[in-house]
């Protein structure tokens, strides 16, 4: 999760800033936007097959947590990019022209005015993108496998990144397959709580940033 978010978040936000603030409107921007919208709607199992072939076989990572993390990164990257773009478009153009009119550089305007103004929407978009794949299992079955042993030391943790590793949704599937219904329903309940928590966190952070910006 940390690997996925640490890659997808800065790349997605940076891509949205470039497309919205630097790139000239035209065919290139339309193609990129169409591509991101298409990727956002592709079934997760397709990402899983691509991740298995590219990260697992071509790059030689095999069935591992890294392969699964990189695959999930590709899944949420277009979502974060599009959500950030929409958040940036909600900022009035008068903010941009006013800052540039008093001599501020474009990057200074983006860093101090545009991003803080769009932050509620950006945070909401990121959390919703992450929430979409909390219950993901199809892509991970093809890339990360179904291992569930936790590392006991820090060195074992980094070694575990190159080994098979499952998620709660995969364990839910395996438990149902084995007839372990009590375990399966317990995992399902935890997943529901996590999804509800993400939704509440989204609303809380959006209101918090909006209040700080206005006050």
What are these model-derived regions, one by one?
Residues 1-3:
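Short, small-residue-biased leader/transition segments that mark boundaries at the very start
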Residues 5-22, 45, 49, 121-133, ...:
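Hydrophobic positions within alpha-helical transmembrane segments of bacterial inner-membrane proteins
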């Amino acid at each position: 999760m940390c690997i996925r978010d640490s890659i997808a978040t800065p790349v997605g936000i940076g891509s949205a800033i470039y497309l919205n603030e630097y790139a000239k409107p035209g065919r290139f921007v339309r193609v990129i936007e169409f591509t991101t919208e298409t990727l956002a709607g592709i079934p997760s199992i397709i990402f899983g097959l691509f991740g298995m072939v590219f990260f697992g076989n071509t790059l030689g990572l095999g069935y591992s947590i890294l392969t699964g993390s990189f695959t999930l990164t590709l899944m949420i990257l277009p979502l974060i990019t599009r959500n950030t773009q929409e958040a940036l478009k909600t900022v009035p153009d008068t903010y941009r022209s006013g800052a540039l009119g008093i001599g501020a550089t474009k990057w200074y305007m983006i860093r101090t005015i545009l991003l803080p103004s769009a932050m509620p929407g950006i945070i909401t978009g990121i959390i919703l993108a992450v929430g979409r794949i909390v219950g993901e299992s199809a892509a991970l079955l093809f890339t990360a496998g179904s291992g569930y042993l936790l590392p006991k030391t820090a060195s074992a943790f980094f070694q575990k990144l190159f080994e098979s590793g499952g998620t709660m949704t995969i364990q839910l599937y395996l438990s149902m397959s084995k007839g372990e219904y009590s375990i399966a329903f317990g995992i399902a309940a935890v997943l529901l709580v996590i999804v509800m928590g993400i939704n509440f966190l989204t609303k809380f952070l959006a209101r918090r940033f909006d209040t700080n910006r206005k006050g």
